[in-house]
Amino acid sequence: MKIFLSLIVLFFAIPLIAEKDPKFRFDGKESPNFFDIQKAFYKEYSEKTDFMQSSKDESNKEGMFYHFKRWEWFWKQRVLPDGEFPQPMILQDIYQKELRRSQKSKTEQALSLKPNWKILGPTNIPIGGGAGRVNGIHIPAGQQNIIWAAAAGGGAWKSTNGGKTWQTTTDKLGTLGVTDITTDPKNPNIVYLATGDAFGADTYYGAAPFSIGLIKSVDGGLTWTQTGLNYQQKDTRALSRVLVHPTNTSIILVGGNNGIHRSTDGGVTFNTRFVGDVKDMEMKPDDPSVYYATSGSKIYISRDAGDKWTELKSNIPTTIGRIAIAVTPAEPEAIFALTAKRGSWDFGGFYRSYDGGENWDIGATTPNIIGRNLQGTDTENQQGWYDLCIAVSPDNPDLIFIGGINIWRSTNGGSNWSINTYWVPNQGRPYVHADVHDLDFINSTTIITGTDGGVSLTTNRGLAWTDLSDGLEITQFYRMSISQQRPDVVIGGAQDNGTSYRSGPNEWKQVWGGDGMDNAIDPVNDKYMFVSSQNGNFGRSTNGGSSFSSSINSAITSEEGEWVTPIEFAPNAKPGAASLVYAGYRDVWKTDSLGFWNKTSNFPNKQSRIMLLAHAPSRPGTLIASNFNASYITYDEGQTWRQIQFPNGIASSIITSFEFHPSNDSIFWISISGFGSRKVFQTNNAGTNSTWTDLSGGMPPIPVNCLRYQPNSPDRLYAGTDLGVYYRDNSTKVWIPYNDGLPNTVI
């Protein structure tokens, strides 16, 4: 008997706190409220029709609207009923308890039920694809073969051979998001991680502003401990930068959305030395007592190793919202500043000082070097709030590289710029994945970068770039499907990196762009497949994944889909007929193998979009459709629908999945999000007057995101949760951890 568990989608991060225009960010405020943020965002942009429409355009995928929708989709099922966010340490505490419980369960499980998880990929990254988002890169001084990568949703990764292979030891940390990483200049085995996701904020529970603080390793990353910068409460902190003094390595500076924190004892204790939303920090190359920091439109200086800070008087206008800075040993008095305008988030100008910040002049203000097109002429949906970085050659202060959506290069100190890399392959420029978050010179000719797709390197000052992302297991999957005829065939939709198709071991290719979302493979004939990007832009294959063409989308339905728009194959009631396909927008749409779509529902409340679809394998025509307000069931392929009644206190808005029994359509299970104690229910009489049994015993109070039933088993269910996988059956009667070999991640 074969069972292919399609629930195992390792998000390695899924949207948390979208770092929008600062008026929607938290900026260190206590107890942000989901509904307040949501209301403020839509109020600001509801009248900007041109902005809203272009933000949804696939070609403009990185607008603020786009990032906000990532965040909203993830959190609307996880916040408390009053809109408050759960305390960051809830999962930490539960995780530690469940880890101890998991160790005990290993000794009690039957041999056949012991997990045997292994990575399927993608580990070999195709051209035009990507591994996942890398926020920061660090190379210890004098050790060019050692590379540390800070993944937005996959923890910290280390290469000891210049990026040929990668390893991680952070799979069991309480957060999988890392913004910045550095090592002790005197001892590279001492490593510091600034946890969370300060800029993109699309990360698992360590995301901005839910950082758990600064963590430390003294053995090269084999083990990790918490430092004195330890966020135990609902602190809403986002850490952006960590620096270690080069001669007195007991001094550590950490920048974040609540200021600059300084330790003088190697991280045992910290004191806040500056209050503000700090985005970047650098040390003066020839004087370790002098540090620079940026906050909003201002640059600050400390002349006593970070103890006291004063503002540098520059001519940078107050309309600037974010500044990235760089220094170089080739001209130690120089400071270079790349800026983005607040609100529009396009290029705000390139500024430079050659006397330690006393005087400033402006280099280029055009073209838009942080935009998306080759010419730098685009103006819509800019994202200087998200990706903004700069690096200056260590031996030539005129050679400067900056990162936005692409990489641009200047050979005259920032007065003029030319595009160096482009986010689309084969366009006359070297290809580097879109959205550049970090740039670092390793030496005078070698530069390394972290992007939404992973890690890339040039050894000839940008003439050619090599992707080093193979082996980085940090892809942020939303959904996956597996062929029931060819178990090697897998489709997965991933954040930032489209939809990937696996045809065999280590054989992956990207088949659909945008953010990869839901997908489906016909269980009867796997030559039929569907893939999608955000809000229901579907592609269809009729040749087993060799090619895909556009299928249903909001232009056809005149209905916008949910951020993750569901699609479902279902058996046809006509004997021998091809499978049916259902897609959920505001209503349910249906097609057969011919590909013609028809609406098959007319639900009330047209403002609510369908979040879930599920069919009964044993009874053709039986389908459940669920939106934020209600859930409905049909037994006749959508001709008539009945509203489902759930247990008291369980609303459709917090249901995350429906799973039918494979041979009895009267039985199905539901899973519940949020942090309450009621997590899984079963009904034996599906319909409008269903009765329910609570099957939550043994499940911790965490979001349960999906359920799968194992055929030909003693009613064995698997549950994907915010803390991995659990299972239960008639012999266990309670949920048992099933995580041996899995990282600590959302399933």
Predicted regions and their residues:
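Bacterial Sec-dependent N-terminal signal peptides
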Residues: 1-25
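Beta-propeller blade termini and top-face loops
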Residues: 25-747
